[in-house]
Amino acid sequence: VKVRIFDIQNLAVAYICLWATSPMLAFGTVYRLAAVAAVGVWAILEMFRPGGIFTRPTLPVLLTGFFILYTAATEALLGADQNFGWHIQIWIMLFFLVFYESRRDDVRSMSSMFWFLLATLPIWYFLTYTAFDQYGTHTARLLTRTSDFAREVSSDGVGGYSLVYSIVAVLPAVALLLLNYRRFVPLEQPRWLTPISRIPLIVPALITANLVLGFALVVRAGFSIAIILMIFSLALSLIFKRRSPLMLMMLPLFMMLAWLAFQIALVPFLQMIAPLTEGTPYYRKVLDVIETLQNDQSQGTLDDRVERYMRSLALFVQNPIFGVISDRDVGKHSAYLDTYARYGVLVGSVFVYLLTYLPVRMMRGMKDNFGLAFSILSIMVLLPLLNDVFASLGVMLFIMVPVACDLVERARVRGPTAPRRRLAVRWGPRVRPAGARAARMSGPESGRA
């Protein structure tokens, strides 16, 4: 059996992806050390691979190295009492950017990891969704910080903030995959999945499971920003196909409509359909979602967020060049604003570039599915601006989204599949119309002797 370097690297990165997305592996020193070892294996193999990314690094790779070294050196100088958890999440996320850069000319080589993740993610979606019945609708919020409860629940496969927001990042691509699955099934890559993909409806069933369970989990988790971003990004990816100045002009209008729909229409709509579900298993679930959304809107979370955003912005204005370095007074609710406040304009701009580089690159290359690339860019602008980032975001942005876009674009190039021939029963000889027979005789063959 011939084993390529790519195959060993794919196995290593597949474990890192599983570790970043699986709640069961979120805690545990052994799991973390295994992830670090997997990163080391990939990096060593990449160093010795002909044409590896380290021999000819691209600009995003160089900036990633600069960002990691600068932030790591700063934290080391400040001492061990600083919060390393936030940085570790970002460094792991940026590792996937480096991995993507090593495969960006051969995106199909990441297909095995894509389908592996597409098969495992519904497991965590389902376990987290069903956990709401046992622990309550605020379970995802309680898992945002390390605690004994978080360790116990995560060991059962229940995810929290990072799982919910990772769904938002990948859901537009999953939706377009479902609409175009007939054009790339059976799968060409990886080849070992080709026979399995020929099983009727197995691929659309897998994509549908990710779409339906992911959508339901985001709604029931009750994160206001996640719901708004999900609806907004899905609308962009499904409505807009080609590049259009009108689309850019209508973008503020769509954002306003999404916000108004959430603030005004969503809760009344759920209250309207709640009586229709009475007597079914969904009645209690609908009431839980209504209660969660009403509590979220009444607890003053918006005012608290705005105060934290303004705190980080004020620190940046006071120290625009080098930042305040320490995270003591930073708002800690916006990845972009916090980075600008801590490290200044240069490092903050590098961070924004690294998270928006890939969506902008896709917007240049995707013509008929421009809305998908634009929706991903919108997510990567708004999500880190309004919240913190996490390791699994790198999995979605730099592995899941590029492979999904490649499948959708490949469907456009290949064109629609030819319709199947149907069995036709004739009771007599086929009679050609007189006009068709005359046209056939008047062709170039009719002049031959």
Region spans (language model):
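Transmembrane signal-anchor hairpin modules in multi-pass inner-membrane enzymes, especially those
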Residues: 1-73, 105-108, 181-201, 245-249, ...
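Helix-loop-helix junctions and helix-breaking kinks within/between transmembrane helices
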Residues: 23-35, 80-85, 197-242, 263-267, ...
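Aromatic-anchored transmembrane helix interface
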Residues: 59-71, 78-126
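Alpha-helical transmembrane segments of multi-pass inner-membrane proteins
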Residues: 110-139, 157-239, 357, 361
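A membrane-periplasm/extracellular boundary helix in multi-pass inner-membrane enzymes
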Residues: 212, 216-218, 234-295, 448
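Transmembrane alpha-helices of multi-pass inner-membrane enzymes
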Residues: 230-231, 372-384, 389-428
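Long extracytoplasmic/lumenal interhelical loops at the membrane interface
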Residues: 290-346, 362
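Hydrophobic transmembrane alpha-helices and their immediate junctions
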Residues: 342-384, 401
